[in-house]
Design a protein with these regions (language model features):
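N-terminal intrinsically disordered/low-complexity leader segments
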Residues: 1-7, 184
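Cytochrome P450 catalytic-core helices
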Residues: 152
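Hydrophobic alpha-helical connector segments
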Residues: 57, 68-99, 144-148
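C-terminal peripheral helix-coil segments that are non-catalytic and often amphipathic
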Residues: 128, 132, 147, 158-184
Length: 184
């Protein structure tokens, strides 16, 4: 008879995400995840297969949390609703090194077809959510959503270089400026 699980798969996958963004792809190990969540590495292999399987499951779970957060966000049309949605999705990163580690994972999203599919799923969810909240603009909503997503992502990079204020405040200011231009 199998022993009962002390730590749920959901908790293990949440711990794996923490390790992923603390360590980066090169230093992400099953041993580091096992230490984070308090189980033995062979247990991780038994439950998730290998390191790649664990990463894919962790990111799939994170996409589910992302979808839930987007679904719970106010759906009113307008600037405030769109900026509020992005505020909900912008992490309060204090350390540019954490942001840089995220960029290393972005590289993996470009290279690995399964990771790329998960990333595209997330971007599609975001694009749809933004498009349905946008106020009337002089371009189609799908194009406007794509452009404001690029502004949002670019603001992360600019903050990493210039470190003006907090990341959430910097992003919000960047999105406000985008709307000022788009609505002019």
């Amino acid at each position: 008879m199998a022993r009962p699980r002390r730590i749920s798969d959901e908790a293990v996958l949440a711990g794996a995400l923490k390790v992923m963004f603390r360590k980066g792809p090169a230093d992400f190990t099953l041993a580091a995840v096992a230490a984070e969540v308090g189980i033995a590495p062979p247990t991780l292999v038994q439950r998730f297969g290998d390191k790649r399987g664990l990463i894919l499951r962790a990111l799939a779970q994170d996409n589910g949390a992302f979808a839930a957060a987007v679904a719970e966000a106010p759906k009113a049309r307008g600037r405030a609703s769109v900026i509020g949605l992005f505020a909900l999705l912008t992490p309060d990163i204090q350390d540019p090194d954490v942001l840089a580690t995220g960029l290393l994972w972005l590289r993996e999203d470009f290279r690995d077809p399964a990771l790329n599919a998960l990333a595209r799923e997330r971007w599609s969810m975001l694009r749809e959510a933004v498009a349905e909240r946008l106020p009337p603009l002089p371009v189609p909503p799908e194009l406007a959503a794509r452009l404001i997503e690029a502004q949002w992502q670019g603001a992360f990079n600019q903050w990493g270089f210039f470190r003006e204020g907090t990341l959430p405040d910097f992003v919000a200011g960047s999105l406000e400026a985008w709307f000022d231009l788009a609505e002019a």
